[in-house]
């Protein structure tokens, strides 16, 4: 970027991680401490699990409704995963741009990469567990998955970690939650202060957007 480049308004924050790394807890803490932020609630065609709530954890729709949303361009990214469709609403991006606020996406690497391709100014942050052993321990401590499910999650985690480390802008290790959140918040502060995000046109110096 040259000195006169100005990025679009709003800060698109993408958080990804393998299951059990703690990204959702970090994302909700960030939302709580960022009053003007918009949180992206994914749309999915799968059925609710456990205590999941409509409009809180996901927006649950049938396949026909999802396909209609695709045709109307209502998703900033969407994908089919294990026979179910998942998508992130374009309206979240539009709202963050209009309000010059932050949009927070809690999605997988595939979705994060899709957003980055469409919006190169998006900030991608990958949350790592301190070790694979600790990740497996966390999954077992949930006491919600069978041994076979945990085995599949661990295999998927290795692939997700490799892709995240290779392509994401930042990596945050979630060993201690408060330290991890401090690191995450530091990324947000630094990105807000990037030269390309600061409008200096009002200074009347003939620079900036």
UniProtKB/Swiss-Prot annotation:
It is an enzyme of class 2 (transferase). Its EC number is 2.7.4.8. Residues 10-189 form the Guanylate kinase-like domain. The keyword Transport does not apply. The keyword ATP-binding applies. It catalyses: GMP + ATP = GDP + ADP. Pfam families: Guanylate_kin. It is found in: Cytoplasm. GO terms for molecular function: ATP binding; guanylate kinase activity. One of its GO terms (cellular component) is cytosol. PROSITE patterns: GUANYLATE_KINASE_1 (PS00856), GUANYLATE_KINASE_2 (PS50052). Keywords: ATP-binding, Cytoplasm, Kinase, Nucleotide-binding, Transferase. ATP binds at residues 17-24. It comes from the Bacteria. CDD domains: GMPK. Essential for recycling GMP and indirectly, cGMP. Belongs to the guanylate kinase family. This is Guanylate kinase.
